[in-house]
Amino acid sequence: MSAQDYYGNSASKQSYSRPSAPPPGYETASRGYAPSQSQQNYYPPQQQQQQYQQQPQYYQQQQPQYYQQHPQQPIYVQQQPASSGNEDCLAGCLAGLCLCCTLDMLF
C-alpha cells in the first residue's frame, strides 16, 4: 500500500477557513473576567510585589521537608544459614563417592 493510497489524493482534501464572526450568544464575560474589569487591574501592583518576595522564603522553608518525606530504601543483606559443622565432611564423602564410581566404570 502506498502513501497516496493510504492518505488519499491531495486534491480531495478539504481546506479549513476561519469563521469571520464569533458564534451567536458569545460574550466577553464568558472568558472568566467581569465585563467592567480588565485583566491588568485585577491585582494591585503591591500584592504582586509582596507575592514575589514571599516565594523564595516559601521554597526555602519547604525544601528540607521535601527531602524528609521520602523514606529511605531498605537495604537487603543475604545471610548465610547457620552451619552445623558437617558440610565439609559431606562434601568430602560426595567427592570420594564420585571418584570411586568413576574408577569402577573405567576398570
Swiss-Prot record:
The protein's name: Lipid-anchored protein YDL012C
Organism annotation: Saccharomyces cerevisiae (strain ATCC 204508 / S288c) (Baker's yeast)
Record's signal peptide: none
Membrane-topology annotation of the record: Lipid-anchor
Family: Belongs to the CYSTM1 family.
Polar residues bias locations: 1-18
Pfam families, A to Z: CYSTM
PANTHER family: CYSTEINE-RICH AND TRANSMEMBRANE DOMAIN-CONTAINING PROTEIN 1
Covalent cross-link site, Glycyl lysine isopeptide (Lys-Gly) (interchain with G-Cter in ubiquitin): K13
Primary localisation category: membrane
Lineage of source species: Eukaryota, Fungi, Dikarya, Ascomycota, Saccharomycotina
Subcellular location: Cell membrane
InterPro entries in the record: CYSTM1-like, CYSTM_dom
